[in-house]
Amino acid sequence: THDSPWYRLYSEYRASRINPDDFLNRMFINAEAVKAEYEPYDLVWRFWLMACVQQCLDRNVPMWDLFTEEEILAWTEVENYCFYLQKSKDESNFGRGWGLAAYTLRHILEESAKDIRLGRHGVNLNFGHDGTVTCLLVNLDADNWGKTVDSPDKVYDIWQNWNIPMGSNVQFIFYRNDDGEIILK
């Protein structure tokens, strides 16, 4: 993964937005010793991830206080860009993310076609995490999800990974009109 084009783009953008030394120097008496043991960006990212996850727990531990407002915004933009590089139609991921969703979409449509052909009524449920749902929306060109940009600084304007919930409901409703024609809503 670290040799892939998308990861290089992600790393370059991360380096342009985040200085791990600022955080590490605030947190540790001897930041150099810590950096000798841990990759600086990875360690700071783990603290940021803990702060993100902590807000979902029933304990009120204010981990966001470890970061400046600028660092919180920077990490939000960087991780949003990472998600974009992994899941969008950006050329750097060679279609891996949305290619997986193409399989999911094909499965949904094939199962639906079979039910329609056999005259069945019912529901087919397919489960996918937020990444799968995002890629599905990319394939469908829903809202801005299918768009690409030419600069990492523009991603934030069209792509916000926090708008994809961990649990989603995407529905394809097929029905026949009075003439028996199948219509997709």
Where are these regions (language model features)?
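Signature for phosphate-centric chemistry
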Residues: 1-124, 128-185
